[in-house]
């Protein structure tokens, strides 16, 4: 993981989302998840391209088991987009870069 992506924990998740001035994209992932590994470099690219309006974060569901159930996460990778502290969009599964950009552009105009 690069410095462009913020690693969240159960302990700081809610506070981080509430205090962020930018939109926050959260990737719920696990080390054993192959689609998560495919998505990781795409998220790094997105973090750089959208740095002026978006913060990309990750939360490992094995190390932080309390946050995912609060958002009914049943499959990973799961991407949740928060804007002004509110959940505005969700995507489950590995997306291509084009699909992810299309998803983000719906909400980050």
Curated annotation (Swiss-Prot):
The keyword Transport applies. InterPro entries: Thioredoxin, Thioredoxin-like_sf, Thioredoxin_domain. This is Thioredoxin. One of its GO terms (biological process) is cell redox homeostasis. The keyword Membrane does not apply. SUPFAM superfamilies: Thioredoxin-like (SSF52833). PROSITE patterns: THIOREDOXIN_2. It comes from the Bacteria. Belongs to the thioredoxin family. Pfam families: Thioredoxin. It comes from Buchnera aphidicola subsp. Baizongia pistaciae (strain Bp). Participates in various redox reactions through the reversible oxidation of its active center dithiol to a disulfide and catalyzes dithiol-disulfide exchange reactions. Residues 2-109 form the Thioredoxin domain. Signal peptide: none annotated. Keywords: Disulfide bond, Electron transport, Redox-active center, Transport. GO terms for molecular function: protein-disulfide reductase activity. One of its GO terms (cellular component) is cytosol.
